[in-house]
Amino acid sequence: ELIHYIISSTEEKVGCLFLEESVKQSGLGLLSVQASKRFHITSEDDRDWTIDDKIKALDELRNLEQVVFWNHFGSSTLDNLLTRVRYMVKGLDCQYIILDHISMVIYETTNERKAIDDIMVKLRTLVQELGIHLIVVSHLSRPQGTGHEEGANISLNQLRGSHSLAQLPDMILALERNTQAVNEEERNRTCVRVLKNRFSGESGPAALLQWTKQSGRLTEIPFNLNDDDTNEDEEDE
C-alpha cells in the first residue's frame, strides 16, 4: 500500500530492500494493490481473479519503473546493505528507501544491542548525507501480560534490540492489531500510533485502517472514540 501510494501520488522512485521475501512476491503484492485483487491466492476454489486481471493490472501500473527491488532473499551484511542503498540513491535516483527488516542485517558480533546501535548510526549518517527518506521496519520485544497479537499497545521501549531504534529516527509509527479478536471486522482493523514525532511533537493514535478480505486492501476509517483505549493525554490531543 505504501509503495503504491508513493508512486501513484509522486514522481519519486522507491528502493525496496525486503529481506524476508523474494522480488516475485514483492512485485505480485504491488500488482495486487493496483488491481484490488489477491493475486497470491492461487487455489481455483478461493481465487476471484483471472490471468487477464493480472495482465490488466500490469498494463495499468505504468509507473512501475519508479520501483527498484533488491534481488536478494535472506540476511545481508551491513556493508553490502549500505552499498546497495547508496547505489539506489546515487545511481538510480531513489528518494525513498524501505528496509524490511533491520534484524535481518548480519553483523559480525553476537551482541545484538551493539550491532543494532552501529547499524542505526550508519543508516542515520547515510540519511543525512544523501537527503533521503528511509523507512526501517523493526520487530518488537514480547510484553508482559497481553501480547501484541492480542492488540496490546506498543511503546518505545518494546523496540527489540537497542535504544538507538527509539533515539535516532525522526518519526516512529506503531501498527497495532488484535489478530485474535472474535469479531472479524475488529480482527482486520489496525491502529496506526505515533510514538515519536520530532517535527511537531504530536503523538498518539493517528489513523484506523480496515483490511478487506475481498480486495486485500487497507482503507482508512473513522475513529470510534468509545472504543479508543488511549490515555487521557492522547485523548486531549
Model regions and ranges:
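Helical hairpin unit composed of two closely spaced alpha helices linked by a short loop
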Residues: 94-134
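Generic enzyme active-site microenvironment
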Residues: 18, 98, 137, 168
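Cytosolic-facing regulatory segments adjacent to core modules
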Residues: 8-93, 107, 206-208
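A structural motif corresponding to the C-terminal end of an alpha-helix
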Residues: 60-69, 126-134, 165-170
